[in-house]
From Swiss-Prot:
<keyword id="KW-1113">Inhibition of host RLR pathway by virus</keyword>
<dbReference type="InterPro" id="IPR001591">
    <property type="entry name" value="INV_PB2"/>
</dbReference>
<keyword id="KW-1191">Eukaryotic host transcription shutoff by virus</keyword>
<dbReference type="GO" id="GO:0033650">
    <property type="term" value="C:host cell mitochondrion"/>
</dbReference>
<keyword id="KW-0507">mRNA processing</keyword>
<keyword id="KW-1190">Host gene expression shutoff by virus</keyword>
<dbReference type="GO" id="GO:0039657">
    <property type="term" value="P:symbiont-mediated suppression of host gene expression"/>
</dbReference>
<keyword id="KW-0899">Viral immunoevasion</keyword>
<dbReference type="GO" id="GO:0006370">
    <property type="term" value="P:7-methylguanosine mRNA capping"/>
</dbReference>
<dbReference type="Pfam" id="PF20951">
    <property type="entry name" value="Flu_PB2_6th"/>
</dbReference>
<dbReference type="GO" id="GO:0003968">
    <property type="term" value="F:RNA-directed RNA polymerase activity"/>
</dbReference>
<dbReference type="GO" id="GO:0003723">
    <property type="term" value="F:RNA binding"/>
</dbReference>
<comment type="subunit">
    <text>Influenza RNA polymerase is composed of three subunits: PB1, PB2 and PA. Interacts (via N-terminus) with PB1 (via C-terminus). Interacts with nucleoprotein NP (via N-terminus). Interacts (via N-terminus) with host MAVS (via N-terminus); this interaction inhibits host innate immune response.</text>
</comment>
<dbReference type="InterPro" id="IPR049115">
    <property type="entry name" value="Flu_PB2_C"/>
</dbReference>
<protein>
    <recommendedName>
        <fullName>Polymerase basic protein 2</fullName>
    </recommendedName>
</protein>
<feature type="site" description="Mammalian adaptation">
    <location>
        <position position="627"/>
    </location>
</feature>
<dbReference type="GO" id="GO:0042025">
    <property type="term" value="C:host cell nucleus"/>
</dbReference>
Length: 759
């Protein structure tokens, strides 16, 4: 009541009324701004004002039992007054100091695990080396970069499920952990974080950093892998750069790098096979990178590179809508065109059929070492503004743009015939023919292009046909700029289609990518790439083909053996024997094949001539299309170790050495595996194994289906008949006995019956 009286008294004085109405505080908007909502509007001011009070902090009541009322200096740490509107107590900032000095120690074992990404960053910086600072103009271009080293590659949704499962396992809500990486991470984290006292929210934040790739669109000159981006602020400014070598690598950068190498190898190999698309898919599905299936990585990893995008397109995944030509990524920024076939004549009077883009268009071109802006009309380059690291890189960009412009003077600059072929020996399309031609030598192209006087524009200079800079003249329409062109920032992905020859098109039918665009650069992968597909055996050279082929036969011997006797043609056509053919001299391949096939036929016809080691050894030679000839061979030549080495038709050699006693095969001194099967040289063991409990009825009878191996016989029902392959490579018809009592006599009658059945 007293208060209200006092206020009424104040209000009756005219001066009070004037102050309250004339000053701006009565603006409802301002009052609202500072009083509505929970969000603090001026945190700095609030903090200063709060800290000026004696007890600015509130704490749980239990704190009064854990902290003394006064510290050693006799200062009060908490007030006996309750916080208005809650049952908490008011505490002095000095209480925090006391707690930090004298409070209970907590277990720190979980800190390095939770804050793993920070601890690892400190280690990388500790071991990194900073070099000299150079002052020079920095050509920075904005690229989408990974800013978070050391992460797994889960999608936001996958990570959310993992985090919920680890941090809040008892919360309700459907969580489906499907991918291998999700399950592994969840198990690992649950074990690591047992009895963890750090707040669940903090744990969730830190897990997110570890599981999800975070990207930003940042200006970069130099390394773009995440271990360089984390120190971007230390290594490059507007006019300076500091050399830096990271003090450690992170798995996500290694995955990106190894994925690009694997994809390039696979696309290059698929392009030369009979059915490129089927081969590519087979290889992607059977390849592992650092122990993880390549297809899983492709689904999660956002790396954009030509070969990687071709693999993604083959798997039906969306990719970026930009297209690739001459190793540059083109993105149309304005204009449009229609395509029309046109025949043009080169300087050598060769006719080329090109698809002409009619209409005005503008593009950005982004390469590894140069970038450009291109404006063009129908078969005419209007303007090209290039920036690049060095003369060579700038020249590359100019050549690509000139070819892409389809100008007549470019086509007339061709000297000699265009007959470039791809790895599969097929002619390249005309645009790539032109590109390859001028990439080899662009002198005539630049000379014929023409020059023009130029205006003095800030940040731009001219470039002459011999690639020297100039401020007076420049090649027509071409300028060099100090500023780079930013990479296309959008993360948009489009649905694409891919044809059998690995050409990727958007839904309008424009070709975005083709195998010609895949870089030939060879690198060494950081993570182990395991190609299980036979198509990739040759990647490590001829020796690897030899060893892998024989390993494959030994691993699959049971089925190979049956096919050898039943359906040899199908066996000879197996794709696993394809790589081997490149080791056999072309001129004699057919004769070797004819010879081996005849030899094998004799083995099938004549009892007791079946020889496991010899079949394994000669089988790959039978895969080539056979030529009939009377030639007899005692040895075959294979091209390995840079020269011809010999495989003996009968007997061992350094190339192929089979030890009958241990059943171990060594190829070129490398272990190629051990044969696990019944000894088929002596017949006794085989017969008892085959025939115990079976009655031999006579010769093979095709009505009872293909021959079974010994191991498959056990599945027969009593009284059931089947053909079976016995040790010598012969096939006989047997019946499973109806009674078990007569098993003993089987082995004795077996030998007689087999001889009768076969003869």
């Amino acid at each position: 009541m007293e208060r209200i009286k006092e206020l009424r008294n104040l209000m009756s004085q005219s001066r009070t009324r004037e102050i309250l109405t004339k000053t701006t505080v009565d603006h409802m908007a301002i009052i609202k701004k500072y009083t509505s909502g929970r969000q603090e509007k001026n945190p700095a001011l609030r903090m200063k004002w709060m800290m000026a009070m004696k007890y600015p902090i509130t704490a749980d009541k239990r704190i009064t039992e854990m902290i003394p009322e006064r510290n050693e200096q006799g200062q009060t740490l908490w007030s006996k007054m309750n916080d208005a509107g809650s049952d908490r107590v008011m505490v002095s900032p000095l209480a925090v100091t006391w707690w930090n000095r004298n409070g209970p120690m907590t277990n720190t074992v979980h800190y390095p695990k939770i804050y793993k990404t920070y601890f690892e960053r400190v280690e990388r910086l500790k071991h990194g080396t900073f070099g000299p600072v150079h002052f020079r103009n920095q050509v920075k271009i904005r690229r989408r970069v990974d800013i978070n080293p050391g992460h797994a590659d889960l999608s936001a949704k996958e990570a959310q499920d993992v985090i919920m499962e680890v941090v809040f396992p008892n919360e309700v809500g459907a969580r489906i952990l499907t991918s291998e990486s999700q399950l592994t991470i969840t198990k690992e984290k649950k074990e690591e974080l047992q009895d963890c006292k750090i707040s669940p929210l903090m744990v969730a934040y830190m897990l997110e950093r570890e599981l999800v790739r975070k990207t930003r669109f940042l200006p970069v000159a130099g390394g773009t892998s995440s271990v360089y981006i984390e120190v971007l602020h230390l290594t490059q400014g507007t006019c300076w750069e500091q050399m830096y070598t990271p003090g450690g690598e992170v798995r996500n950068d290694d995955v990106d790098q190894s994925l690009i190498i694997a994809a390039r190898n696979i696309v290059r190999r698929a392009a030369v096979s009979a059915d490129p698309l089927a081969s590519l898919l087979e290889m992607c599905h059977s390849t592992q990178i650092g122990g993880i299936r390549m297809v899983d990585i492709l689904r999660q990893n956002p790396t954009e590179e030509q070969a990687v995008d071709i693999c993604k397109a083959a798997m039906g995944l969306r990719i970026s809508s930009s297209f690739s030509f001459g190793g540059f990524t083109f993105k149309r920024t304005s204009g449009s065109s229609v395509k029309r076939e046109e025949e043009v004549l080169t300087g050598n009077l060769q006719t080329l059929k090109i698809r002409v883009h009619e209409g005005y268009e503008e593009f950005t071109m982004v390469g590894r070492r140069a970038t450009a802006i291109l404006r063009k009309a129908t078969r005419r380059l209007i303007q090209l503004i290039v920036s690049g690291r060095d003369e060579q890189s700038i020249a590359e960009a100019i050549i690509v743009a000139m070819v892409f412009s389809q100008e007549d003077c470019m086509i007339k600059a061709v000297r000699g015939d265009l007959n470039f072929v791809n790895r599969a020996n097929q002619r390249l399309n005309p645009m790539h023919q032109l590109l390859r031609h001028f990439q080899k030598d662009a002198k005539v192209l630049f000379q014929n292009w023409g020059v023009e006087p130029i205006d003095n524009v800030m940040g731009m200079i001219g470039i002459l046909p011999d690639m020297t800079p100039s401020i007076e003249m420049s090649m027509r329409g071409v300028r060099v700029s100090k500023m780079g062109v930013d990479e296309y920032s959008s993360m948009e992905r489009v649905v694409v289609s891919i044809d059998r020859f690995l050409r990727v098109r958007d839904q309008r039918g424009n070709v975005l990518l083709s195998p010609e665009e895949v870089s030939e650069t060879q690198g060494t992968e950081k993570l182990t790439i395991t190609y299980s597909s036979s198509m990739m055996w040759e990647i490590n050279g001829p020796e690897s083909v030899l060893v892998n082929t024989y390993q494959w036969i030994i691993r699959n011997w049971e089925t190979v053996k049956i096919q050898w006797s039943q359906n040899p043609t199908m066996l000879y056509n197996k794709m696993e024997f394809e790589p081997f053919q490149s080791l056999v001299p072309k001129a004699i391949r057919g004769q070797y094949s004819g010879f081996v096939r005849t030899l094998f036929q004799q083995m099938r016809d004549v009892l007791g001539t079946f020889d496991t080691a010899q079949i394994i050894k000669l089988l790959p030679f039978a895969a080539a299309p056979p030529k009939q000839s009377r030639m007899q061979f005692s040895s075959f030549t294979v091209n390995v170790r840079g020269s011809g080495m010999r495989i003996l038709v009968r007997g061992n050699s350094p190339v192929f050495n089979y030890n009958k006693a241990t059943k171990r095969l060594t190829v070129l001194g490398k272990d190629a595996g051990t044969l696990t099967e019944d000894p088929d040289e002596g017949t006794a063991g085989v017969e008892s194994a085959v025939l115990r409990g079976f009655l031999i009825l006579g010769k093979e009878d095709r009505r009872y289906g293909p021959a079974l191996s010994i191991n498959e016989l056990s599945n027969l029902a009593k009284g059931e008949k089947a053909n079976v392959l016995i040790g010598q490579g012969d096939v006989v018809l047997v019946m499973k006995r109806k009674r078990d009592s007569s098993i003993l006599t089987d082995s004795q009658t077996a030998t007689k019956r087999i001889r009768m059945a076969i003869n």
